[in-house]
Amino acid sequence: MILHGAAVSVKTAVAMHRISYILYNYEQEFAPEDFYIVGSNQVLLNYITGVLPELNVYGVSQMTMEQLFVRLLYEDWDKSWKIKPVVKGVTPAVKGTLVWFKELENFCLRYEYRAIPREDVVIEKTGKVLLDRATIARLLKETKNLSRADKISRLTDYLMARLENELSGKYYSYTQPEKQKLKHYYETYFGKREWKGSVAELYEQFLKEEQEKDFPVEVPDGSYDVYDLAAMAYLYKRIKEDTVIREAGHVVIDEAQDFGMMAYASLKYCLSKCTYTIMGDVAQNISDRYGLNDWTELRKLMLPGEFDYFGILQKSYRNT
């Protein structure tokens, strides 16, 4: 749900009552720990969550958008690093846009293209094609938006099924040692799920490629703004993660206009199983090109379903 309303419309109170309603009516599916409340600063967050005890809700996590992306970096966040604010006129505005997210997506596709074999998979002894390049291309296309590890798993499962059919077939016979050797070889043919690289170094590689395309961006030196963190969290989820870590089931975002589409696109990918309550007033976007000036792109990204809702508070609920 996206909720638009002016400052006096008490969007926050509506959202907090929604949390209370969900917890009361769906207690088997949700616990307070399943909710994250995300805002642009700690003062605002303290005010928001101050309402919850009055609704008999305790244990809900609160964090800034920067803190959420740091959380999603897990072990790749170095505690010596620092979070820096987006500075109007200094931070390149493109970093907060959907265009920038698409650049990052394409970078990951190129990285995976180089890392994952795409030629015919052939058994040397018999010349048997286990998996042809067309099938590999089709499987990669079908899994385009999955993580690198999930792509590898899908390809490996398909390949190993073909191998089992070949080893149990009647046209060629294989000794037991040959079977074991082939299985051992092909189970990591497309690579291992585990990726031991550095997300920060991969992000630096991305930025350097973008510099060559004349994007006016700099490589951070241990200090990262919200859009750096959003990009790194996406890289972690897309390239590094090999075991899914359970996060929130529902995320509430206040003052949504303060964040650009790069943050939302990354969040949507990293927390793809989440539902969202997003509140804001695009007329209050004082960041110009760094935040949201309208809801069009965000509605398209976050509200694809038939029952997703975009609402406008037409009057104040402060005194009603």
Show which residues each predicted segment covers.
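Catalytic acidic motif of RecA-like/P-loop NTPases
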Residues: S20, Q257-D258, A283-Q284
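Alpha-helical nucleic-acid-binding subdomain
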Residues: L23-V252, Q257-S266, C274, E306-I312
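Conserved RecA-like helicase ATPase core segment
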Residues: C270-T320
